[in-house]
Amino acid sequence: MYKSLFFFLKIFAILILLGCSVTAYIIYHYSHDLPDYSQLVRYYPPSVTRIYSRDGKLMEEYAFERRVFVPINNVPSSLIESFIAAEDKNFYNHPGIDLLGIVRAAFLNISNYLHNRRMEGASTITQQVVKNFLLTNEVSLERKIKEVIISYMISRVFTKHQILELYLNQTFFGRGAYGVAAAAQNYFNKSIEELTIAESAFIAALPKAPSELNPDKNYSRVKARRDYVIERMFEDGYITRDTMKEAIGSPIVLRKRAKEETVTADYYAAQVREEVIKMLNSKEEFYRGGLTIITSLDAQMQKLAENALRKGLREFDRRHGFRKPIANIPLDHWQEALKNIPTPSSLLEYKLAVVLDVSDNHAKIGLIDGSKARIPIIEMQWARSNLKSVKTLLKKGDVIVVEPIKDCYALRQIPEINGAIMVMNPHTGQVLASVGGYDFSTSKFDRVTQALRQPGSLTKTFVYLAALENGVKPNQIFNDGPIEIMQGPGMPSWRPKNYEGQFLGEMTMRTGFEKSRNLITVRVATAVGLTKIVDIIKRFGINNEPKKVYSMVLGSIETTLSRITNAYAIIANGGKKVEPHFIELIKDRNGKIIYRRDNRECFSCNILDSDLDTAILEIPKEDIYRVTDEASDYQITSFLTGAIDSGTGYAARKLGKIIAGKTGTSNDSKDTWFIGFTPKIVVGSYVGYDTPKELGKKATGSNVVLPIFIDFMNHAYKDEPSLPFKVPDSIKLIAVDRITGKMIPDGTVIEAFKVNNIQMLENDYMIDNHDIFIPGISDQSQEIY
C-alpha cells in the first residue's frame, strides 16, 4: 500500500516538474519576440477634435476614432465598479490573469456547450488591454500565450489604476464611440459624471458585443445584459438591493444631443478644418489631436443666414417655372415604387410624393409612409403663368417634390441655382456666419471662399473712392453720355454702355453712383487714372493682380465673396485694415492654449468642454492700419447709404435702419451680388450658377440678391437700434441741390465735404465741372451698342 502511494506521489511530482518545465520553456520561447509594452507609458490615444461656436454650441466633430480621453481620477467610482462587475470581478486581486476565473469559465463552458449556449470568456481587463494595444484579434494558441505573459508582466509594472485608464479610454463601445466619455455622450448625451447606475451598467455591458447590443434593434437582449451587470454589482457589494431593483426597473432611454446644444454650419466647419490643418501642417494631428476649437460663429446668425439664402434661391428658381416631374411610376403598389425612386440630392426638408389623381383645382398625392394628401392649385401657381387647371401641369404617376404647409402640401422643386452669404463684424473681422452653398451634402464647394466670380458694379465703390481720395468733390458734375476709350496701339476701342442702354445726361458724381451708371463710372475712372484704381483694388484685397484695363472698373476682375465682403468691411469700420477670421482660439487635449487670435491675457480661455457655454472671449485690440483716410471713407459710406435711400438698393429701406450698400451685376447677368452694412455688421451675398450662365435678362443684384439681405436683416437685426455712421472731424456736412450740385440752404441732399475743401467751395459757389478735361475720352453722339 505504501509502495503504491509512493509510486503515485512520484508520478505526481514528475508531472508537476514536467508541467513546470513545459511552462518555463513556453515562457522562454514566447518571451523573445513580445511587443514592447513600454509604449503604454506614453499612451496618446486618437481623440475627437471638436469645433464650437462662440457661444459654446457644438458645430462639428472630426476624428479617426471618436474618443475623448478621461484621466482615471475623473472617472466616477460607480462607472469603474460597473466594469469590474461586468468584466473582471477579481481585477484588484490577480496578477493580470485570473486562474480561478479560467477554471470557473472552463466548467461553465462545459455546461454551456451541453445546453447549446454561448461560451464565456475568462479574459481579464489587463488581458483585454494587451489585446487592444499590443496584439491582434487572431484566434490562436500562440496569441493567447503571449497575451497571458504580457498581462502578467504589465501587472508588475503598471498600477491597477493605470491599467483601468488604458482600458476605459481605448475600448470600442459601438456607434463610433471609443472610450467611456464618448460612449456616455453618444448614448445618453451626458458627461460620465452625470451617468446613473443603470446607464453606467449599460455602457459596461457593451464591450462584449458592441455592434450587436443595439437597443433600437434588440431591446430585450440589451436590457438583459445590462440587468446582469447590475445584479453582479449587487452581488459584489457595490450597490444595495434597493438600488439594484430601482436600476433594473428603469428603461433604457437613449438621448441625442439637443438641437439647442448644436449648430449646423457645414461650410464654416470645413473652412475651419482647412485652416487648422494648414496651421498645424498636419492632417494627422487635426484628426487625432483632441483639439478644442472655438470659432467666431454666431449660432443664431448662422441659422438665419442659411434660411435667407435657401429661401432666396428657391424663390428665384420658382420665378422661372416648373421644369418637370422627377419620374413617372405605375400606381399599382405605388408606395413600394416610390420607395425605389432614388432620393434626389438636396431634398432637405422637402419630401417625395406621387400624384395619385388630378382635377382642375387640386392634385391628390401619396407619400413614402403611405399617407395621402392634396396640393391645391394655389400652391402650384408659380409653376406656370396663368395656370388654370392642374391637369395641364401634372398627370397620374408623376413623382414630384413637395413641402408640407399647414393642412396641405405645396409643389416644389430643388433649385439649380446656387449662392452664398457671409456675415462679418467689420471692426474685428470675426466671421459671424458663412454659408457656402445651398446644401453641403450635395456640393462641398464653398462659394464664399473658393468661387472666383466677377463682382460687377461692386467694383464701382472703389473707383469712386479712388476719386474721393484724390480730391474729386462728391458734387462734381459728370456726363452720362456715350463714350469711347482708346486703349492704345493695336487695341480695339472700348465703348461701354449703361445697363438699360439709355443716357441721362449730366449729374453729380453721387447721383451717378446711386443709380449705378456705368458711363459715369468710366468717366470718373478716366479722370483718376487706372494706376490709382489698380492700387486701391489691391490695397483693399479684392484682387492681388488686377489687369490694368478699363473694363476692370465695371467689374470684369475676379474675386471671391469673402474678399469683396472684407473690402466693404474696411469701409464700414472707417477705413482700418481688417481680415476675415473664423477661429478665435485652439486648445490641445490637455486644455493648453496653442493658438489665440488675440495675444492679450484671456481670463475665460482656461475652460473645459463642459464650461464652453459660459465662456466669453474678449474683443481683440486689432493692430490699427489705415487702408484709406477717414474723410474719404465717410464720403463713400455716404454714397453707399444714398444707394439704399434713393438708388439700386432702395428696397432695403423697408428695414427702417441706416444701411449702406451696393448691388452688383456682372456682364450678361451671370453673377449677381449685394453687400450691405451698418456700423456693427457687414453682410455679403452672391447668387449665380456654378457653371456661369445668364440668370435672365432682367436678373440683377437688386431683384435676385437684395431680397436675401433684406430677409436676413429683418430677422437678425429687427430689434437692433438704427445707428448712424460716425462723422469724422475732417468732414463737414453741407446741403446741396441733388441735380445741380450747388450749395443751397434748403438743398435736397446733405453732402459730405472734406474740411480742407470747404474754402475752395466757398470761393466757387457754383460748382460746374462740365468742361473738365479727361484725356483719352472721345464723346460720341451716336448710341453705343
From Swiss-Prot:
UniProt keyword terms in alphabetical order: Antibiotic resistance, Carboxypeptidase, Cell inner membrane, Cell membrane, Cell shape, Cell wall biogenesis/degradation, Glycosyltransferase, Hydrolase, Membrane, Multifunctional enzyme, Peptidoglycan synthesis, Protease, Signal-anchor, Transferase, Transmembrane, Transmembrane helix
Residue numbers spanned by region Transpeptidase: 398-711
PANTHER family, per the entry: BINDING PROTEIN TRANSPEPTIDASE, PUTATIVE-RELATED, PENICILLIN-BINDING PROTEIN 1A
Sequence ranges on the Periplasmic membrane side: 28-785
GO biological process, one term: peptidoglycan biosynthetic process
List of catalytic residues: E87, S457
Chain ranges passing through the membrane: 7-27
Signal peptide: none
Listed name of the protein: Penicillin-binding protein 1A
Subcellular localization, as worded in the UniProt entry: Cell inner membrane
Domain of life of the organism encoding this protein: Bacteria
Enzyme Commission numbers on file: 2.4.99.28, 3.4.16.4
Role according to the record: Cell wall formation. Synthesis of cross-linked peptidoglycan from the lipid intermediates. The enzyme has a penicillin-insensitive transglycosylase N-terminal domain (formation of linear glycan strands) and a penicillin-sensitive transpeptidase C-terminal domain (cross-linking of the peptide subunits).
Catalytic activity: [GlcNAc-(1->4)-Mur2Ac(oyl-L-Ala-gamma-D-Glu-L-Lys-D-Ala-D-Ala)](n)-di-trans,octa-cis-undecaprenyl diphosphate + beta-D-GlcNAc-(1->4)-Mur2Ac(oyl-L-Ala-gamma-D-Glu-L-Lys-D-Ala-D-Ala)-di-trans,octa-cis-undecaprenyl diphosphate = [GlcNAc-(1->4)-Mur2Ac(oyl-L-Ala-gamma-D-Glu-L-Lys-D-Ala-D-Ala)](n+1)-di-trans,octa-cis-undecaprenyl diphosphate + di-trans,octa-cis-undecaprenyl diphosphate + H(+); Preferential cleavage: (Ac)2-L-Lys-D-Ala-|-D-Ala. Also transpeptidation of peptidyl-alanyl moieties that are N-acyl substituents of D-alanine
Pathway the protein acts in: Cell wall biogenesis; peptidoglycan biosynthesis
Database matches in InterPro entries: Beta-lactam/transpept-like (IPR012338), Glyco_trans_51 (IPR001264), Glycosyltr_51/Transpeptidase (IPR050396), Lysozyme-like_dom_sf (IPR023346), PBP_transglycosylase (IPR036950), PCB_OB (IPR031376), PCN-bd_Tpept (IPR001460)
Family designation: In the N-terminal section; belongs to the glycosyltransferase 51 family. In the C-terminal section; belongs to the transpeptidase family.
Pfam families on file: PCB_OB (PF17092), Transgly (PF00912), Transpeptidase (PF00905)
Topological region Cytoplasmic: 1-6
GO cellular component: outer membrane-bounded periplasmic space; plasma membrane
Ranges for region Transglycosylase: 49-220
GO molecular function: penicillin binding; peptidoglycan glycosyltransferase activity; serine-type D-Ala-D-Ala carboxypeptidase activity
NCBIfam families: PBP_1a_fam
